Amino acid sequence: MNNNIYGIDFGTCNFKVFSKASGKFITEKNTIALINKNQMYAYGDEAYAMYEKAPESINVVFPLSSGVIADYNFLQMMIFEFIEKRMKGKTKNAEFLVAVPTDITDVEKRAFFELFYKSKSRPKNVMLCEKPLADAVGLGIDVNEPTGVMVVDMGADTIEISVISLGGLVLSDLMHFGSNRLDESIISYIRREFNLVIGKKTAMALKEQLGSGLPGRTETMVVVGLDV
């Protein structure tokens, strides 16, 4: 049996990889820092630490948008850097199971296949799995039971709501907004109410530390920004 298998979840914000052979699991920011426009300088959490702080010579980019590939070449480079250097894994003749959104087009699916098949690793097999099913299995749910289970996946650019039963999707709806929209709303509100420009990282900190789905919270937080 081949144990050289990797499970991969490409999120707009976070990137997750699991190695069956070693049992290692990593999750880092899906971010790349570039110099000279096309040379990878850093990736993952290291690149994200430069976001909104880097000089003009360093461009920090996010290679996925709304769950689909926005920058093919750099995403391909990053995935194999992660596996081979961070996880000390072997990619040649490996198998890859990739979680993808349910509503992507055939062209977008082909891009995920080519991400691996057109790489130097020459994989043995590449399989795509619909994200709601991967989420349910990861939560320990028996997806083959004749019981409807609702799975809600809230991401940076999308929110996917699905019902699973008997090993398949009964229905699924993908909405093209997510936590990034909340960050943008917080940035707009702070600017409108206080004439203060804050960055996305500050907005995320406000959301994560003070945000609540219920009224009545009274905590406060000091933030720093540009007075306009």
Regions found by a protein language model. Give the residues of each.
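Nucleotide/phosphate-binding catalytic cleft detector across ATP-hydrolyzing
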Residues: 1-154, 164-228
